[in-house]
Amino acid sequence: MTKKTIYFICTGNSCRSQMAEGWAKQILADDWNVYSAGIETHGVNPKAIEAMKEVGIDISNHTSDLIDNNIIKNSNLVVTLCSDADVNCPSLPTNVKKEHWGFDDPAGKPWSEFQRVRDEIKIAIENFKSR
């Protein structure tokens, strides 16, 4: 069976989309190719790396990438993770489905916010898998 492609997008491809990519590569790997990107690039947030490391997922080699139109047009699903990405997401081909899963931005917030958002993203991806 050919894998589908899911593309997670947030503002800076720094926290939320990086954590979503890390979780999805673990949870959805059998059925989905997983990518993430941002409207801008802010670099991968070190606290996002640490938050994922805490649950045994290594995203330290991830890079902060701009949206790639080739990945978009070959995606089955684009998931925006913040309102900025939802509003500024490039127009999608008609065959690409889009969903918005809004999460708070943990950047600049206490460590507990990174943990909370990380865990909320995991739950959303697990719920998506069980659909």
From Swiss-Prot:
Keywords: Arsenical resistance, Cytoplasm, Disulfide bond, Oxidoreductase, Redox-active center. The keyword Disulfide bond applies. One of its GO terms (cellular component) is cytoplasm. GO terms for molecular function: arsenate reductase (thioredoxin) activity; protein tyrosine phosphatase activity. Disulfide bonds join 10-82, 82-89. Its main location: cytoplasm. Catalyzes the reduction of arsenate [As(V)] to arsenite [As(III)]. This is Arsenate reductase. It comes from Staphylococcus aureus (strain NCTC 8325 / PS 47). The lineage of its organism: Bacteria, Bacillati, Bacillota, Bacilli, Bacillales.
